[in-house]
């Protein structure tokens, strides 16, 4: 008897477990079909692909018991995939859903916006008079998905009686939560929506089970999209994590990727720059209002087996105290344990997801995969790369490709190389090194130490073809300089891909964030050193953005 959580082997379900524990509730995991009979309330969180979810539920003998549980009238709360499986089908694959809601799940229209829909957006209650199930109209909730149930009363009037809230992305309205009888589901992730999300979870869990049984049907009405959606710009705090010379894991920050102190003193000469402990800093940035956190492992732990990796312990500990999205980078590749056990990239990523990560960031391995794709004619990958295997299992929204380019200066009058169409031209009032010059952006691997015969445009487009759901754009020339984001680079990449893009490298002030959001259509911006050194506080940064009429989460 009691509350059960269903995990079919999805991405990060640990964060929901951490949320429930933090809120003071007890639960058990569903481990066998009989647990559905024991459960008096069921929560089904899920991140990943619809087809994979249905397949895994069937393989484990849980699909039919899940359907019977929902039909029994006992309280059910589905999150993301846990909501989508209630529908008839998904254009993501051929598998059929449970058919509880007579409507298909379809992909977003990518012609006027980036897909996946990724970030913090509002949720508008369709019938406020019937209660809001913990959803606050003034709050933002975290979404990350490429497929949605369109709000379509003309073609699916019966399905629309399930609508509890709608959300607008671009000019599309979709069901961001559903409710009827004892069933509740959210497309957004309350466990990743900060205090607003925790309040929603707590509200549902504290409601007496008898009160879950009578949620009314929603009125079917025409809803018109607003001129603009409420999706916010995201501020991401990044922490480069490595072992210092004493063996402790610390957050450091490089100057053009060099993380060792240059000041010559007895204590610091050549030492790894130490800016704090990763778990404590992550908690600090969460409390300060960071929209996402990124932990980049820049130390090799080749002598540790996968399950003993120090970064896994960092992720587990951080996920217990932060309830916003967490990206992990570094080491997401095929590897071999000290005892010779092979660990494919998919298994490595899965370990981080189960520890509490939401996305994985892939760097050098993405370059090698796109080189292979280019050699094969750009059609499609062979399915073996880390990008492809992880995206297939967990959805493309779980895969970030991190690009580390360098500028290559050329004489625009004489350059006739293959990247002429990608050249950026220096401005007369720009830095002296850029005047009368042009340059293209060359990709690197191994932390910027090795250049490859590939441009940033080739890598970004190739990564999207292979299945990346987000592109993180760094620039070695600007890293740690405080000169501001390279707006030309950000605009170049945004023009070439349809997935969300994160600007990185060079932030030195709040104005630099204002500039990148004003001058480019980028979805998010990332910084590290200025936050670590408290040169810019996240709260002050958001105030500056709001003062410039840039929509951000409070």
Spans of model-derived segments:
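Cysteine-nucleophile active-site neighborhood
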Residues: 47-121
């Amino acid at each position: 008897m009691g509350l059960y959580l269903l995990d079919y082997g999805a991405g990060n379900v640990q964060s929901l477990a951490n949320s429930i524990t933090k809120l003071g509730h007890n639960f058990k995991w569903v481990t066998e079909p009989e647990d559905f009979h024991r459960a008096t309330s069921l929560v089904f969180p899920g991140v990943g692909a619809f087809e994979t979810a249905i397949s895994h539920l069937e393989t484990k003998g849980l699909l039919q018991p899940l359907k019977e549980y929902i039909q029994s009238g006992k309280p059910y709360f589905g999150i993301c995939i846990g909501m989508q499986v209630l529908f008839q089908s998904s254009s993501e694959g051929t598998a059929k859903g449970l058919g509880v809601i007579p409507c298909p799940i379809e992909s977003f229209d990518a012609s006027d916006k980036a897909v996946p829909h990724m970030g913090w957006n509002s949720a508008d209650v369709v019938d406020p008079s019937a209660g809001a199930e913990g959803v606050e109209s003034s709050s933002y909730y975290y979404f990350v998905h490429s497929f949605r149930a369109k709000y379509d009363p003309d073609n699916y009037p019966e399905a629309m009686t399930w609508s509890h809230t709608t959300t607008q992305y671009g000019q599309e309205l979709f069901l961001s939560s559903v409710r009827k009888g004892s069933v509740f589901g959210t497309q957004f992730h309350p466990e990743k929506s900060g205090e607003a999300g925790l309040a929603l979870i707590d509200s549902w869990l504290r409601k007496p089970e008898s009160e879950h049984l009578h949620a009314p049907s929603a009125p079917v009405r025409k809803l018109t999209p607003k001129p603009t959606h409420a999706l916010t710009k995201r501020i991401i705090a990044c922490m480069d994590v490595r072992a210092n010379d004493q063996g402790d894991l610390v957050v450091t920050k490089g100057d053009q990727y060099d993380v060792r102190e240059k000041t010559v003193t007895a204590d610091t000469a050549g030492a790894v720059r130490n800016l704090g402990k990763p778990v404590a800093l992550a908690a600090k940035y969460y409390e300060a209002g960071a929209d996402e956190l990124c932990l980049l492992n820049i130390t090799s732990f080749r002598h540790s087996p996968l399950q003993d990796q120090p970064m896994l312990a960092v992720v587990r500990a951080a996920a217990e105290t932060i309830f916003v999205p967490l990206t992990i980078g570094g080491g997401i590749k095929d590897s071999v344990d000290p005892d010779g056990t092979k660990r494919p990239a998919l298994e490595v990523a899965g370990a981080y997801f189960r520890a509490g990560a939401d996305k994985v960031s892939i760097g050098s391995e993405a370059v090698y995969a796109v080189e292979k794709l280019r050699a094969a004619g750009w059609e499609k990958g062979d399915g073996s790369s880390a990008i492809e295997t992880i995206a297939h299992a967990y959805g493309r929204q779980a895969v970030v490709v991190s690009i580390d380019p360098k500028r290559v200066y050329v004489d625009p009058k004489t350059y006739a190389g293959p990247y002429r169409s990608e050249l950026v031209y220096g401005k007369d009032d720009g830095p002296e090194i850029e005047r009368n010059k042009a340059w293209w952006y060359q990709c690197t691997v191994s932390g910027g130490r090795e250049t490859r015969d590939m441009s940033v445009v080739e890598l970004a487009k190739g990564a999207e073809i292979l299945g990346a759901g987000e592109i993180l754009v760094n620039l070695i020339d600007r890293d740690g300089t405080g000169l501001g984001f390279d707006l030309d680079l950000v605009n170049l990449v945004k023009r070439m891909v349809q997935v969300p893009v994160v600007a990185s490298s060079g932030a030195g002030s709040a104005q630099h964030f204002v500039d990148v959001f004003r001058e480019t259509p980028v979805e998010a911006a990332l910084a590290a050193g200025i936050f670590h050194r408290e040169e810019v506080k996240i709260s002050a940064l958001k105030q500056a953005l709001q003062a410039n009429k840039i929509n951000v989460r409070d």
